Structures are given as C-alpha cells and as structure tokens.
From Swiss-Prot:
Region (Disordered), start-end ranges: 410-429
Polar residues: bias regions: 418-429
InterPro entries per UniProt: Hud_Sxl_RNA (IPR002343), Nucleotide-bd_a/b_plait_sf (IPR012677), RBD_domain_sf (IPR035979), RRM_dom (IPR000504)
Function, as annotated: RNA-binding protein involved in the regulation of flowering time. Acts as a repressor of the activity of SOC1, a transcriptional activator of flowering time. Binds to the 3'-UTR of SOC1 mRNA in the cytoplasm and participates in SOC1 mRNA decay, mediated by the distal region of the SOC1 3'-UTR.
The protein's name: RNA-binding protein BRN2
Tissues where this protein is expressed: Expressed in roots, stems, flowers and siliques.
Record SMART domains: RRM
A single GO molecular function term of this UniProt record: mRNA binding
Length: 429
C-alpha cells in the first residue's frame, strides 16, 4: 500500500493542447507511447455535453518520461485535423510539487538568511533559499525555499505553519507549497464556491450570478470551463409571505412601502433594525441580509455590462489605477471586511443596493493577504446611501462592518481650509 502511494506521488501530469477533437484516448495513448512511457491519457470534455474540448491530460511514471514527451511533441508535431502544433507542458503546479518548493510568509522584515537557514534546516537539507526583496533590497517578509525531498518539506510545514513565531514578528509563520498565479486564481474561485450553492434555474438568486470561470485556463491553451455561482434563495413560489414583504424599488429609493411582516413569517425572519434577517443559511455566513433591498430582487444572471472592468471576472485583484470612480457621494469606504473576501465577494455583497462600478479590497503586496478594508463605487448617490443605511454595522463573518462615504481630495482640502483662521478671515471680509 505504501509503495502504491509513493508511486502515485512520483507520477507526473502533463497538459496537452491543440488535440483534434475526433481523436480518442486510445489513439492518443498509442501516439505518445511511441516516444516515452505514458500511463494514461484523459481527454478533457465539456461538463454538460461531454464533447471533447481539444485538449487532454496525460500521466507519466517519472519526470524523465514526462520530459521525453515534452521534447518530442511540444511545438514539433501537428496532428491531422489540428491547425497548430501540439502544446505539451507540465500541468499547473506540477513543477512546484516535483521540486518540493515552499512559500514562507510573515517573516520579520529584518530577518537574515542565516536565521532562516538555521530554523528550516532542522527539518531537512535545503537545496535553495531565496528571500524576496523590493527595489531597495529590503525584505518583503517572505521567501521561497526548496528541500531535498518531499518528506522534509512536509515535516517543515507541519511543524512551523501557523505555529512558530520568529523573533521580531507578531504573527505565526505561513508555510505552504509554492503555487502559480493560476492556482491562486483557482483557489479564490473555490473560496467563493464554499460560501454559496450552485445556481439552479428554479431558484432565483438574490444577488444574481456574477459570471466567472470555474478554473483558469491551463497554460493558456484553451482549457477553460465556464461556470457561474449564485446566492440561492428558496423557490419564491413556496414562500407564502414573500409577496407581502418584497417590493421592488419604483425609483423613490424606498423598498418597503406600505408592507409589514405578517404573523406567518417564521421567527428567524423576525425584524431586526427594520430589516428581516438572513434566509436560512444562504449567502455569506454571518451576514444578516434584508429580505427587501432598496432595488428589489435582482435577476439571477446579471449581464457583464452591469459590472465595470474594475471588477475582475477571474478573481484577480485589479490595480487601483484601473478603479472606476462614481460621482461625488457615490463612493464608499468599507472597513472590517472579512480577511477571506476579495474583489468579487465584496462586489457581490454590495450589488443589491445599486449598480456597482468597481470594487476593490486592498491586500499586502508582499504577502497577498487582505488588509480588511476597501472601496465600492456606485453610479448614484442614492445607491451609496442605501448601502450605508443597510450595511453599516452589519455582522459579516464575525466582523462588524463600517460603511461610510469615501472622502475625496476636494472635501479634505475644504476641511483643512475651513480650519485655517486666515481663510475664515477672508470669507468674513
């Protein structure tokens, strides 16, 4: 049993693009085995139709066998029915896994390479160690290191990750497998998936489903499975009290005109600060959403045009320079955002109150960890005010949100001038 497990860990997975859709797994296996040892081939198919997507994974017993396949086929052989040569590369994360490469974060900025060597060498032989530094050669508080074997890397992770605090730091070390940007994107999307259920056509979403890809493309060669996630409510027709409660916005900014909660509403939906509480366990854990939002129920599938380019569809952070500002009084500052939230989650949370032009969660450049604050921009002041009235003080994942208008430079300058006696004297004269 142990030998079988070790054999599986040594296997190497390759991604192959530009595969003719008419070819079968047996045909591909025969082709690749002419040049190297290949254990199996798995054609990647559409999730719903099961039609081939023109790419596949293949598994080799060792890295040497995998390199033979890459050297023999990558950009060198065009199969009948294909327009371009085969693209053969390591699947995402394989190189990092094979090299036993670790990422270490939350290091003191003044840590030396000798200190790190001394700590991590207790768990095995270090082949390579690289402290990440900025333009002024100052440490970013993180590093990459490689061990001689996987067992040594695992031992270091188990002993140090979240448990050891280095001298000069106030938080434990983060020790994990190094990953690629594509893997980080996939992890963000999976994190979103853990908060929500899959969208069902019979169950409309309160927030709609922000279009996003299920997993990122492998090596950029077309393996891209489309998918959406929505925040589901129970079927509307089964909620007998809903027609007495939910009233769409008619343009006057009031969503609860002349409506009241009836006795038929379950206790868990009783009013709280003039808003009903969250419906069951849907939506984000810990956030008490109102049943009636200022803009009423939003369709389950929002078109891409309703979200500005400032909100990425693949889960990556967008630089502040690309932020889309709303009109004066329509931009919000959000504090105490849950640490696991990113741009997409923030946008989805504030989408019910109006058209979101952009959403940004600020992260530490060195560690990639959220700073727990960000900004939301709406297309109108009314939407921003509705968001403040509803969300300020709400509990979200155990944190009490602080939602207020973002101060622009003009307001700050005016406030500073108003405090200046000379400026006040000129006004009075």
């Amino acid at each position: 049993m142990a030998e079988e497990t070790m054999e599986n860990e040594e296997r190497v997975k390759l991604f192959v693009g530009q595969v003719p859709k008419h070819m079968t797994e047996i045909q591909l296996l025969t082709l690749f085995r002419e040049f190297s040892i290949v254990n199996e081939v798995n054609i990647i198919k559409e999730k719903t139709t099961r039609a081939p997507r023109g790419c596949c994974f293949l598994t080799c017993p060792t890295r040497e066998d995998a390199d033979k396949v890459i050297n023999s086929f990558h950009n060198k052989k065009t199969l009948p029915g294909a327009s371009s040569p085969l693209q053969v590369k390591y699947a995402d994360g394989e190189l990092e896994r094979l090299e036993h490469k670790l990422f270490v974060g939350m290091l003191p900025k003044n840590v030396s390479e000798t200190e790190v060597q001394s700590l991590f060498s207790e768990y095995g032989t270090i082949k390579d160690l690289q402290i990440l530094r900025g333009s002024l050669q100052t440490s970013k508080g993180c590093l990459f290191l490689k061990y001689e074997s996987k067992e040594q890397a695992v031992a270091a992770m188990e002993a140090l990750n979240g448990r050891h605090i280095m001298e000069g730091a106030n938080v434990p070390l983060i020790v994990k497998w190094a990953d690629t940007e594509k893997e980080r994107q996939a992890r963000r999307l999976l994190k979103v998936q853990s908060h929500v259920s899959r969208l069902d056509p019979q169950n409309p979403s309160m927030f709609g489903a922000l279009p996003m890809s299920y997993v990122p493309p492998y090596n950029g060669y077309g393996y891209h499975v489309p998918g959406t996630y929505g925040y589901m409510l129970p079927p509307i027709q089964t909620q007998h009290a809903f027609h007495n409660v939910i009233s769409p916005n008619q343009g006057n900014g009031r969503a609860l005109q002349g409506t009241a909660l009836t006795e038929s509403v379950p206790p868990r939906l009783a009013p709280r600060r003039n808003f009903p509480t969250a419906l069951g366990n849907y939506g984000y854990h810990g956030l008490q959403y109102p049943m009636a939002f200022p803009r009423g129920m939003i369709p389950p599938r929002l078109p891409l045009t309703t979200v500005s380019p400032g909100i990425s569809n693949n889960g990556t952070s967008i630089p502040s320079s690309l932020q889309t500002e709303g009109p004066a009084g329509a931009n919000l500052f959000i504090y105490n955002i849950p640490r696991e939230f990113e741009d997409q989650e923030l946008a989805a949370t504030f989408q019910p109150f109006g058209k979101v032009l952009s959403a940004k969660v600020f992260v530490d450049k060195a560690t990639g960890i959220s700073k727990c604050f960000g900004f939301i921009s709406y297309d109108s002041q009314a939407a921003a005010q509705n968001a403040i009235n509803t969300m300020n003080g709400c509990q979200l994942s155990g944190k009490k949100l602080k939602v207020q208008l973002k101060r622009d430079n003009g307001q700050q300058q005016q406030q500073q001038q108003s405090k200046n006696p000379l400026f006040n004297g000129l006004l009075n004269s």
